[in-house]
Amino acid sequence: MEKAKSQSLEEDFEGQASHTGPKGVINDWRKFKLESEDSDSVAHSKKEILRQMSSPQSRDDKDSKERFSRKMSVQEYELIHKDKEDENCLRKYRRQCMQDMHQKLSFGPRYGFVYELESGEQFLETIEKEQKITTIVVHIYEDGIKGCDALNSSLICLAAEYPMVKFCKIKASNTGAGDRFSSDVLPTLLVYKGGELLSNFISVTEQLAEEFFTGDVESFLNEYGLLPEKEMHVLEQTNMEEDME
């Protein structure tokens, strides 16, 4: 049973540790567990305790039986305490794996604000030369057009919340294709990744409420799967689930 439990624990974490192969995951778990334990406080093995508990005792030796019962109570307590220590150690290991995973996923370019593009050439350069893993959201606007200022303000907030996404804005008159972006199609949102256009939303404010806020724009983009998950959301959710257990 101990072997089956160990195998189950090892399989649960396959692919989450810093090593990718099954042997690497098993070694990660064993190393983490050994580092977390105090060798002086290791309890008796479960197999030995079960063997002792199932051993026949003389009914005539009442004192010996009572002493044995008291001994088993202590050992049972130590066994339960050991199980709790293993569970806590397992939770710490899971949390460390999640932190390592998020650190790796978060590695890459970070932005955090809205870039003002000054020309069509700069616009094309941004789309073509940015890293392929980066999502680029471009707001094409013009001063005095309803909804453009509000959308710019919302994108400033989203840029801070999603630093791995590159948010840009450019005036329609600066794109070199002003005839394609007349006032009746503004504000327009273009979303790119890897040099490819993912989505094109013209007159985007018509799909929002008359008065919209950052959360409305975020929900709109999430409906189309255009925003990545916020950086520590999964880790925080995992921690909450562990605290509830």
Curated annotation (Swiss-Prot):
Gene Ontology CC, one term: cytosol
UniProt biased composition (Basic and acidic residues): 28-50, 58-69
Cell compartments where the protein resides: Cytoplasm, Cytosol; Nucleus; Cell projection, Cilium, Photoreceptor outer segment; Photoreceptor inner segment
Ranges where the record places region Thioredoxin fold: 111-245
Keyword tRNA processing annotated: no
Keywords: Cell projection, Cilium, Cytoplasm, Nucleus, Phosphoprotein, Sensory transduction, Vision
Domain Phosducin positions: 1-244
Post-translational modification summary for this protein: Light-induced changes in cyclic nucleotide levels modulate the phosphorylation of this protein by cAMP kinase.
Residue ranges, annotated region (Disordered): 1-70
Any GO BP annotation: regulation of G protein-coupled receptor signaling pathway
Pfam families per record: Phosducin
Phosphoserine modification, residue list: 73
Family as reported in the entry's similarity comment: Belongs to the phosducin family.
Function in brief: Inhibits the transcriptional activation activity of the cone-rod homeobox CRX. May participate in the regulation of visual phototransduction or in the integration of photoreceptor metabolism.
Oligomer status and interactors: Interacts with CRX. Forms a complex with the beta and gamma subunits of the GTP-binding protein, transducin.
Protein's name in the database: Phosducin
The organism of origin for this protein: Bos taurus (Bovine)
Gene designation: PDC
